């Protein structure tokens, strides 16, 4: 019996040790998993800044080449998509700081991208139109923007995938 008890205690001891090892492995795996999840989450959230940097660099490249601000580019893109509209209507699509508003639209007029019209019946309203004479320049600008996006497409897609995985 003594030998059997010794074997039983040995088996119980091994079982306890195995359970302790298993518990240790599980705890460490959970900590590793949490750390990995936390690291992946942090990385994904940080990719917001990376993606924003890529987007800002596209606008900077456009600004450098075409001497137009981000707001001016967005105004043109909105006009091309939605058509002519009042300045008040445009405010719903493109946010322009009040202190920059007049200068922004006047710059587009000076560059001849747009022209303004005041209806006869309401002198307070200003309607802006794309200057159709610049159709070729429009195509060139759109191609330039498309190329700028394409050159960063993989990096932006990777950032977006990491963000979505959060």
Curated annotation (Swiss-Prot):
Molecular function terms, GO-annotated: DNA binding; DNA-binding transcription factor activity
Designated name of the protein: HTH-type transcriptional regulator rot
One Gene Ontology biological process: response to stress
Residue ranges of DNA binding: 87-110
Family assignment from sequence similarity: Belongs to the rot family.
Organism: Staphylococcus aureus (strain MRSA252)
Highest classification ranks of the organism: Bacteria, Bacillati, Bacillota, Bacilli, Bacillales
Function: Global regulator with both positive and negative effects that mediates modulation of several genes involved in virulence. Also, modulates the expression of genes not previously implicated in pathogenesis.
Pfam families, A to Z: Staph_reg_Sar_Rot
SMART domains xrefs: HTH_MARR
Keywords: Activator, DNA-binding, Repressor, Transcription, Transcription regulation, Virulence
Domain of life, source organism: Bacteria
NCBIfam families: Staph_reg_Sar
